[in-house]
């Protein structure tokens, strides 16, 4: 666990790194190469400084994907995790658009304010550095702490994300993100995101098993 002093010191260090126009190799190593690279990509995207929420895309009726169907099967489990952990859980598609969320009462208002809801477009080119987009970019688990985020309105957040991998094709189908306030930062956050990704992947396996069963007796 981190103390409040540890976390405040981490925020101060990040602010100091942000003041430099270019990151030295030592600074990039301190920050983490994936975050440093994301900052550089974000800076080149001409994201409006006044942007405080992700663009919100209209949710049109469309055919359900395998990820949508898997979420229907495991949404109760994920919602329970969100409620018990004082977090908001979001699942995004491969384009960084959120397709499903469940939120604790503690995070609901904050999530709605920044459009961390279904339809929110969290691609780096829209909102800059964030864990959801970073995990899709690197195809690895990620953590973005407080002011490591590009958009100032989520500097009070810490976010953990993990890609959702198709257990059969091994392709990335989407991403799951767990977010809470920076004061609740925990070293187990990334493991929790990976656990949620595993829950979705188990639902994908069961979904495929049911399809094969139906096909066998059709």
Where are these regions (language model features)?
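Cytosolic beta-strand hydrophobic patch enriched in CBS
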Residues: 90-91, 163-165
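Short loop/turn segments at beta-alpha junctions that line or gate ligand-sensing/allosteric surfaces
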Residues: 124-129, 135-150
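Short hydrophobic/glycine-rich mini-motifs in sensory/regulatory modules
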Residues: 164-176
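A short beta-strand signature within small-molecule sensing/ligand-binding domains used
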Residues: 154-163
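Intrinsically disordered, acidic Ser/Thr/Pro-rich low-complexity regulatory segments
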Residues: 44, 149-152
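Intrinsically disordered, low-complexity terminal regulatory regions
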Residues: 1-123, 134, 143, 173-218
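Short glycine/serine/proline-enriched coil/turn segments at secondary-structure junctions
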Residues: 151-154, 168-169
């Amino acid at each position: 666990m981190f103390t409040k002093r540890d976390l405040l010191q981490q925020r101060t260090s990040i602010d100091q790194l942000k003041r430099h126009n270019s990151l030295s190799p030592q600074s990039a190593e301190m920050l983490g190469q994936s975050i440093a690279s994301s900052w550089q990509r974000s800076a080149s995207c001409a994201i409006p400084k006044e942007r405080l929420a992700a663009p919100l895309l209209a949710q049109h009726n469309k055919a359900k994907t395998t990820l949508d169907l898997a979420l229907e099967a495991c949404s109760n489990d994920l919602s329970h995790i969100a409620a018990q952990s004082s977090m908001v859980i979001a699942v995004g598609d491969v384009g960084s658009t959120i397709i499903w969320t469940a939120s604790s009462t503690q995070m609901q208002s904050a999530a709605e304010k920044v459009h961390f809801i279904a339809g929110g477009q969290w691609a780096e080119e829209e909102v800059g550095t964030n864990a959801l987009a970073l995990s899709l970019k690197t195809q690895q688990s990620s953590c973005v702490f407080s002011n490591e985020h590009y958009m100032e309105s989520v500097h009070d957040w810490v976010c953990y994300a993990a890609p959702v991998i198709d257990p059969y094709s091994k392709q990335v189908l989407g991403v799951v993100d767990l977010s809470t306030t920076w004061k609740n930062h925990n070293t187990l956050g990334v493991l929790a995101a990976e656990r949620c990704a595993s829950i979705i992947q188990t639902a994908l396996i069961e979904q495929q098993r049911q399809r094969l069963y139906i096909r066998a007796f059709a």
